Design a protein with these regions (language model features):
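N-terminal secretory signal peptides that target proteins for export/translocation
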Residues: 1-8
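Sec-dependent signal peptide hydrophobic core
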Residues: 9-16
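C-terminal motif of bacterial Sec signal peptides marking the signal peptidase cleavage site
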Residues: 20-23
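A sequence/structural signal for flexible, mid-protein segments enriched
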Residues: 25-318
């Protein structure tokens, strides 16, 4: 079996019900603070540049007022499920793999992908996931994929379609008013949106050999306002972990750096999931309103999403 784990980016959302919502009148408190845990699915199938094999993570929601410990995290991943993937004509089983079972070298690689710092001896939860490690069913644009999950006496299903991709026409760095134009530039793009289909987009940014970073807000777009038009779109650079905030260079790209833009096309169900999740994360606070994260999964929470990615690598220059 050829393991492709180093190519995988496993994004883990702990759907712990972390919404302690307040309003001007009175705080919102759930009727039942000890609701039964619900299963959460987070899975993806990809096509295009650097496509990972189909994979998913199974977790459970946590009680509203629960305390989170290393034991809680380790016990939050669901192991032993039967997961099948189908494209309508072929069906395969996804293999289960847990972090604790990996050889030391692969643990280091997996930790990097998962965002854990091994050298600092930080706690790393025993993440278990299910994947098509042999690429027996690689994602293809235009195809629909169904998953079926059997676990804890429950049957969970979901369906997603990898869209026909719409590529960027061009990327261009331009001066930005008020900034040091010799050192930092703004990135703008041009997109010809087809009128015959509804399209949903997202972008991520990688600087040099670093990881892809998703902007904390505004990374998602649909074509409701520019369907069938030629459209110019600015792509601000998101700040990296630990990067200090500087208002004069916020969103700008340092001249001379190699930059990769990951342009993602997705179906509506994945767009709705990410859009409501992103809105919820960015609107927490004492005067925020409750946002229900949308799901396309039947029998559980979460998402099963199909996407197509195109990478554009350019050097920042005028």
């Amino acid at each position: 079996m050829m393991m492709r784990l180093p190519l995988m980016r496993v994004y883990i959302f702990l759907f712990s019900t972390l919404f302690l919502i307040s309003s001007c009148e009175e705080p919102f408190i759930p009727e039942n603070l000890q609701q039964e845990p619900q299963i959460v699915v987070e899975g993806f199938i990809e096509a295009g540049d650097g496509a990972n094999p189909a994979y998913l993570v199974l977790t459970k929601t946590l009680p509203f007022l629960s305390s989170i410990s290393s034991e809680t995290l380790n016990n939050n991943y669901i192991s032993g499920a039967k997961v099948t993937l189908s494209d309508g004509s072929k069906t395969i089983n996804l293999s289960e793999l847990c972090f604790k079972d990996l050889p030391p070298a692969l643990k280091v690689e997996a930790a990097k992908i998962l965002g854990f710092n091994v050298s600092a001896n930080n706690f790393i939860p025993n993440v278990c996931f299910y994947a098509d490690l042999n690429f027996a069913m690689p994602g293809q644009a235009g195809k629909t994929y169904q998953i079926e999950i059997l676990t804890e006496g429950k049957k969970i299903t979901a369906s997603t379609t990898i869209p026909i991709p719409v590529s960027l026409d061009s990327l261009k760095f331009i001066p930005n008013a008020g900034a040091n134009q010799d050192s930092f530039l703004l990135l703008t793009s041009k997109l010809s949106d087809p009128i015959a289909q509804q399209n949903f987009y997202r972008y991520q940014v990688k600087m040099g050999d670093g990881p892809f970073i998703t902007p904390g807000g505004g990374s998602l777009f649909d074509d409701r306002l520019f369907n069938g038009q030629n459209f110019r779109l600015n792509l601000p650079r998101p700040g990296g972990d630990g990067e200090s905030f500087n208002i004069s260079t916020f969103g700008l790209y340092p001249v001379g750096k190699e930059t990769t833009i990951r342009w993602v096309n997705m179906d509506q169900s994945l767009f709705d999931f990410w859009n409501t999740l992103e809105f919820s994360i960015n609107n927490q606070g004492p005067f925020s309103t409750y946002t229900r994260v949308k799901t396309n999964v039947k029998g559980a929470l979460g998402v099963w999403g199909g996407l197509y990615a195109k990478n554009y690598t350019i050097t920042v220059k005028k």
